[in-house]
């Protein structure tokens, strides 16, 4: 079980790829390691199913908490449903891998990446992507690789290759770029309002590093004696495509050239052409090759018709510079935006529509205890900004059962979330946990960017003080030989014909999120740069329309949103506020009808629907944590009496005791002879004993209405509220 290990010196670190040692029955396997992070990646191929017209590729990323030396917190103490982060890494693997398989491949493929050990200095996701390529090549699956991925961070003015988790949090950029020898094949990024030029420079920087990992994979293949060969595509029967081109090209072209029609009208006309063609084919002789082709495969006609429509649409764009709705290549569809469309029971709402894409977003403000706890390998323990994306069937005029979110919904929600995070206010100025839900009411392309715009509207309507509003646009690119056309704001019918689709979100200052996917084996960085730059005018145009609906965040919150007060106490006094068994903090919350959260750092957040109640709770906590000094004078009420003395609340929540001997200069037989519960008295702190107990005295302290002529000037009194 020795296997072979190849080490690569990579930006001052060593990346190790071990092959031939693990998972011997998998088609191909590699253990890819850097530091103490180890990811086992396997690729397996099985015979394809008959009658399918797509590539059945499954990419899985498995997290095991033993990788971080932890035991799962579930009842069964084992991993259950993959966390959201694992789903996003599945997509990160799938997106650069899928376009690199031959279009004719129909075999079942499964890539499984398992994080076996995690070093907080080395995130596992980009290692898993590179490992997926290596395992696929070792499995001898037809594949236009090698492919590799790296992460690029930005600390100050310097790019950092494969930064640690801590560096990612501190930096202004978190960008993953995947590439092949042909060029860039995938980009995923979150940025702190970075100019387009900086993001493009980072992509170029990352692609140079990708090239080194590609060479390493090629070296491993050579040492293993594996020659990478892409089998020729199976012979395709051209009878039906040729027939459709002659019979339908003109009529399809006429429909595509009617720019004033609606999507429904265009779809109806194309369906009519296909139905008429199907009837014509059914009228042919049984022995006719066209009818034989259609009879042999029920999907042959719709697939060939769709392919012809795609070809004609691409030709119309490349030759005439016109799209199916008559727009120019750089033109955005009509936009409408509104804020506050729902009653204020909903804390904030926004409705955004671009063409037939319509998204309703809502914002809900919560307390720190509403933060999402992360039970995964991410060092971050919680999330305070959540974005959830829903895509019901009715949004595309279809029916299907309502199920839990799939990978697509999770991915789109995460992209829109990433776009907003850089402009959220600092926690110490706005301590709310915020959840935004984007409901896609109608979909005709670019719903994720519609969710970004809807989120901005809802957050501003909720009174969240965003640093800058964010908008987003979906772009497309068609490449035919050396000719390249970039499309702004692609709609649904265009999504399937472009060679690259990418989404860009940001403010007027710069980019906050970027997602770029290819359907070809790679593009030069120069073309990617052109696409990124063309998205900026579209984003700013959309942003201008949004600002017509709401120019700045509302000054006040919804009356139904909780009111929060946040302040800091000495962390060593947290136990004083909580009290034995939580008794003290429970009494405060019950007395003031508030909700109180205390962080380990000493930050206290009080939530209440009544601002006065929150202020009362704050005064109590400040009283509990305020340092009391000997000699200080306070005015307070008698709270209880015991045989040897009386207790006085000198500060909200903080009591001291007057011993019976300190009630008067004269001898006192019974405490009640001098004071009663509820009496207001002025006391001086006589001493604080070694257990922190406050001992008070009335002796020599003038009370209300008494002369203070012979008394020394008291120290400042801390009044009760």
From Swiss-Prot:
UniProt superkingdom: Bacteria
InterPro entries: ExoRNase_PH_dom1, ExoRNase_PH_dom2, ExoRNase_PH_dom2_sf, KH_dom, KH_dom_type_1, KH_dom_type_1_sf, NA-bd_OB-fold, PNPase
Catalytic activity: RNA(n+1) + phosphate = RNA(n) + a ribonucleoside 5'-diphosphate
Molecular function as annotated in GO: 3'-5'-RNA exonuclease activity; magnesium ion binding; polyribonucleotide nucleotidyltransferase activity; RNA binding
Residue span, KH domain: 562-621
Annotated family: Belongs to the polyribonucleotide nucleotidyltransferase family.
GO cellular component labels: cytosol
Record: residues binding Mg(2+): 495, 501
Compartments reported by the entry: Cytoplasm
Enzyme Commission number, as recorded: 2.7.7.8
EC class (word): transferase
Cofactor: Mg(2+)
Protein name: Polyribonucleotide nucleotidyltransferase
Record organism: Synechococcus sp. (strain CC9311)
BP-aspect Gene Ontology terms: mRNA catabolic process; RNA processing
Domain S1 motif, residue spans: 631-699
Region called Disordered, residue ranges: 700-721
